[in-house]
């Protein structure tokens, strides 16, 4: 969901039959349906996230999969069968149609969240590739061409109960409102990371904390057993407080963290050092959704009613 002046665009993953690529819903300021936003989807096979920079007349969209593919759960073989995305799409924002595709290949398996810098003059942006556990940096060159590079690569980790090393599963990324820090999660590993992106070509790791995950490094946080891993997160506008939740998608939760059915999810708060870099879990904050009156419940994402780091575009 993103603002469009006084209006709203919402991305969809598929149609009523669960078939990709979906498209974009255009709402007016009263939340009444205007219609489809896009004039054409071109040959885009999948949809997921999007972000735009009006001053560059560009929108970038990413790919997950068709609802019929991901809703039953995750099957690694379907990645090889090309049922999951590996591309970013460049749009002509004014014409509302895709004009270019960046093929990421093995470096960009399941590219999910897309973020441009908040500076409206900047052409620099990032995408987190969930299965590859990489961060892709893209920008417009001086010649006016869109370029991309892999700037962060999270190594897979061995696990005694897994036949293959565990990928991080980077399901989200976030850029602070001042464009100084990029945050990422590794949902299966169990860590949150902070990178200084003052030089977007060379992010510098400045902070890391653990919560839940399959590696067993922080199974309990503030007295609560974390069944899940860091998944979605929201940063305060001053960049000092981050709220992290643990549920990705119910069937995927049940597949990788079956205890979440009975334990529920949790919200953890991280204190972020905006001057020198660094992260630490706030010891005085925890929300245990397993103890909800009608629970156990799961928590997916936190948003601010007046706008936040993941919705506001200038």
Model-derived features: where do they sit?
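Short, conserved, GDST-rich strand-edge loop motifs in beta-rich repeat architectures
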Residues: 11-20, 62-83, 128, 135-138, ...
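Surface-exposed loop and turn segments in beta-propeller and other repeat-based domains
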Residues: 37-45, 98-109, 146-166, 206-226, ...
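Beta-rich catalytic cores
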Residues: 20, 46-48, 84, 110-112, ...
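Structural signature of eukaryotic scaffold interfaces centered on beta-propeller domains
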Residues: 1-4, 51-57, 113-121, 165-178, ...
């Amino acid at each position: 969901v993103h603002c469009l002046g006084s209006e709203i665009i919402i991305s969809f993953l598929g149609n009523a039959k669960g078939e990709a690529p979906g498209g974009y819903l255009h709402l007016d300021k009263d939340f009444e349906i205007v219609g489809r936003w896009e004039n054409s989807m071109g040959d885009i096979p999948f949809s997921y996230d999007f972000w735009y920079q009006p001053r560059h007349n560009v929108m970038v969209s990413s790919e997950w999969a068709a609802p019929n593919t991901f809703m039953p759960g995750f099957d690694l073989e379907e990645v090889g069968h090309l049922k999951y995305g590996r591309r970013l799409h460049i749009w002509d924002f004014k014409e509302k149609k895709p004009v270019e595709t960046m093929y990421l290949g093995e470096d960009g398996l399941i590219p999910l969240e897309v973020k441009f810098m908040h500076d409206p003059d900047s052409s620099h942006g990032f995408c987190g590739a969930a299965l590859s556990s990489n961060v892709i940096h893209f920008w417009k060159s001086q010649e006016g061409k869109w370029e991309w590079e892999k700037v962060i690569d999270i190594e897979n980790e061995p696990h005694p109960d897994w036949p293959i090393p565990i990928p991080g599963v980077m399901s989200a990324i976030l850029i602070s409102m001042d464009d100084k820090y990029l945050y990422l999660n590794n949902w299966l590993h169990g860590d949150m990371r902070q990178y200084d992106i003052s030089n977007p070509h060379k992010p510098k790791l400045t902070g890391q904390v653990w919560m839940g995950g399959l590696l067993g490094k922080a199974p309990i946080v503030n007295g609560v057993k974390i069944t899940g891993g860091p998944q979605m997160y929201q940063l305060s506008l001053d960049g000092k407080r981050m709220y992290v939740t643990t549920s990705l998608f119910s069937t995927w939760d049940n597949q990788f963290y079956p205890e979440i059915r009975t334990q529920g999810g949790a919200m953890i708060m991280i204190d972020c050092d905006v001057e020198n870099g660094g992260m630490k879990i706030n010891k005085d904050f925890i929300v245990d959704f397993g103890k909800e009156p009608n629970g156990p419940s799961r928590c997916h994402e936190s948003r601010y009613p007046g706008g936040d780091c993941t919705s506001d575009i200038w």
